């Protein structure tokens, strides 16, 4: 999608601080971190949100969660714990209409989150 911020980041048109990349997904640090470790993992294919996940594209979501688990171990926060968040739609405060998962770690999280 030509006007999508995350598609432009994935395509290299907009710089990012990359954490991880493979054929299906791209992970990069958040520009306004809400925790000592805060990065986003996005599918390379443009999927608008969790609400747009289908049987045809759900394998990439499973893959993203495998990547999150791998990165949590590599970056050393798997045992302490972390939070994975996806905001959906206007009421959910989704700011970029491209499916993404925030991974937050490095501090105790509070509840309720919003």
What are these regions, as identified by a protein language model?
Residues 1-114:
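HIT superfamily nucleotide-processing domains
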């Amino acid at each position: 999608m030509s006007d999508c911020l995350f598609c432009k980041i994935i395509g290299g048109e907009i710089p990012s601080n990359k954490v991880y990349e493979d054929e299906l997904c791209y992970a990069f640090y958040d520009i306004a971190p809400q925790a000592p470790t805060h990065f986003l993992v996005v599918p390379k294919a443009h999927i608008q949100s969790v609400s747009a996940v289908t049987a045809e594209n759900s394998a990439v979501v499973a893959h993203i969660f495998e990547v999150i688990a791998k990165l949590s171990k590599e970056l050393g926060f798997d045992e302490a714990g972390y939070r994975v968040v996806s905001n959906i739609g206007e009421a959910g405060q989704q700011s970029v209409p491209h499916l993404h998962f925030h991974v937050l770690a490095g501090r105790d999280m509070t509840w309720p989150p919003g």
